[in-house]
Swiss-Prot record:
The gene is minE. NCBIfam families: minE, PRK00296.1, PRK13989.1. Gene3D superfamilies: Cell division topological specificity factor MinE. Prevents the cell division inhibition by proteins MinC and MinD at internal division sites while permitting inhibition at polar sites. This ensures cell division at the proper site by restricting the formation of a division septum at the midpoint of the long axis of the cell. This is Cell division topological specificity factor. SUPFAM superfamilies: Cell division protein MinE topological specificity domain. Keywords: Cell cycle, Cell division.
Length: 84
């Protein structure tokens, strides 16, 4: 046994497999950090435009939220309507 063998990694793996494993961890972490989809602001803008055809509202009176529970996604839309 060489003294340098003691400091070497005991687990022999190819650099490609190590890189793949690290990339999978990074991708999983990024997916977990992404709480809102990219299309949500555009969807909110279009919904406000459609609602304005029927009711006089401001943009800040509409809140859009997307919630995911397992394989089900829930789009929640809250609109503060003006008094009549």
């Amino acid at each position: 046994m060489n003294i340098f063998d003691f400091f070497r990694d005991r687990k022999k793996g190819s650099t490609a497999s190590v890189a793949k494993e690290r990339l999978q961890i990074i991708v999983a972490h990024e997916r977990g950090q992404r709480s809102t989809p990219d299309y949500l602001p555009a969807l909110q803008k279009e919904l406000v435009e459609v609602i304005r055809k029927y009711v006089n509202i401001e943009s800040d009176q509409v809140q859009v939220a997307l919630e995911s529970q397992g394989s089900c996604s829930i789009l929640e839309l809250n609109i503060t309507l003006p008094d009549r």
